[in-house]
Design a protein with these regions (language model features):
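Conserved short alpha-helical segments that host acidic/polar catalytic motifs at enzyme active sites
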Residues: 1-187
Length: 187
């Protein structure tokens, strides 16, 4: 596995991708997936306007990475704790969407992962639940089982997400076109 930084990896498409942070401007976060651990760097600021983002994104590299620009759901605070990615050991996670009722996800989380919660988002609960399934079923099967359970038992606008570890990157593209959040413009 070769380590590269994201602008090099994405090439000319990176500047277009960065424009997304003008709308998704509540925070940005970068997870670097290395063989033994995931490292997260995040800031409560728009990536497009952040000097720190420019420095970090150009100078950090890893065999795998996740970059997230957050557009906070109404009622959820814009804080460092609520910024994505979330990580545990060598696993990092980002999510775009909304689960409902998201506090009910807490009942699915193993006690050993409950104490990892720092913020108050559905995304973090989603991640902690996936960790529960991963521990019980392995990385790939745990993610598949967790997504299937959320899809069948929760209302959601989307559970679009990415989860990475030192061996795998799983991308979930799942949304309900009939349950579009009322607070978004039709972009």
């Amino acid at each position: 596995k070769t380590s590269v930084n994201l602008p090099e990896f994405m090439g000319q498409g990176f500047s277009d991708f960065l424009k997304l942070s003008e709308v998704h401007n509540d925070s940005w976060g970068l997870a670097l997936a290395n063989p033994d651990s995931a490292t997260v760097i995040k800031e409560v600021a728009s990536a497009a306007a952040s000097a720190r983002f420019s420095e970090v994104i150009s100078n950090q590299s890893a065999p795998g990475a996740l970059l997230h620009f957050r557009w906070a759901s109404p009622g959820l605070e814009v804080t460092h704790e609520n910024a994505h990615p979330f990580c545990f050991e060598d696993i990092a996670f980002i999510h775009n969407g909304a689960l409902s009722p998201y506090e009910a996800v807490k009942t699915l989380i193993a006690p050993e992962f409950e104490s990892l919660r720092e913020g108050d988002t559905d995304s973090e609960l989603f991640f902690l639940y996936l960790l529960t399934e991963i521990k019980a079923n392995g990385f790939v099967e745990g993610v598949v089982k967790g997504i299937k359970n959320l899809k069948e038992n929760f209302e959601y606008s989307s559970i679009n997400s990415m989860i990475i570890n030192s061996e795998y990157l799983i991308v979930v593209s799942e949304h309900d076109p009939l349950n579009k959040p009322g607070w978004t413009d039709d972009l």
